[in-house]
Amino acid sequence: MAELLAVEGLTAGYGDSIALEGVSLALEDGDSLALLGRNGVGKTTLLVTLMGLTRVRAGTLRWRSTDFAAWPTHRRSQSGIGWVPQERHMFPSLTVEEHLTAVARPGPWTVGRVYEIFPRLAERRGNYGNQLSGGEQQMLAIGRALMVNPALLLLDEPMEGLAPIIVQELLSVIRDLVTGSGMAVIIVEQHAKLALSLTRQTIVLERGRVVHRCASEALLRDPDTLHRLVAVT
């Protein structure tokens, strides 16, 4: 498969503070990566850096072999990076359908297809963003990211704070996206075993540095190492 994303020696942060140091990773088309670590180690920072929202101090970022470190966020999105932020970023003045159509790019993902995987959004298509439950907002955030028809989907804590029945619904959708959509996926998820079960490879961050990388299946079979790497102490 062709190289999609390459990050080499990335050092980045906010203002004068450094949140990531010397981070490297690579993804091919259709690949999947779990990004694990304790709270505050730089997982979300890595995703927002990929979206152009932090200050890159060193290292290289390549998208399909092209350096994209200087690209603004909208160009990254237009080039095929979909982002589901932890905060969801709903607009109270836009309806469900307007959230979807506002970012739409040509491709297999359409409003109708989003409604197929999330029928609840079809029922709420005329509702405003602030009229949705937390689970519905997360469905909309994922649907909106899919509407850019991404080659890479970034998921930041997609299950956080949701009822178990909603988690199961989202898990089914995300599993199908990882295994059957052809797009690459990076998942930040506090439930480490869940993230490992969904992905092919894993990196673990500690204090902004990569301290472990392996096949997800191998770490899933090694609970002692997993606990040592991600358990809260």
Which role does the model predict for each range below?
Residues 59-68, 79, 109, 113-116, ...:
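Conserved ABC transporter NBD signature motif
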Residues 51:
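Helix-to-loop junction immediately C-terminal to a conserved catalytic motif
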Residues 168-181:
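Helical segment within the ABC ATPase nucleotide-binding domain
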Residues 153-157:
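Catalytic Walker B motif of ABC-type/P-loop ATPase nucleotide-binding domains
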Residues 55, 67-88, 111, 123-127, ...:
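ABC ATPase NBD coupling module
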Residues 36-38:
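The feature captures the beta-strand-to-loop junction immediately N-terminal to the Walker
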Residues 145-146:
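ABC ATPase C-loop
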Residues 198, 204-209, 213, 220-233:
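C-terminal boundary and immediately downstream tail of ABC-type ATPase nucleotide-binding domains
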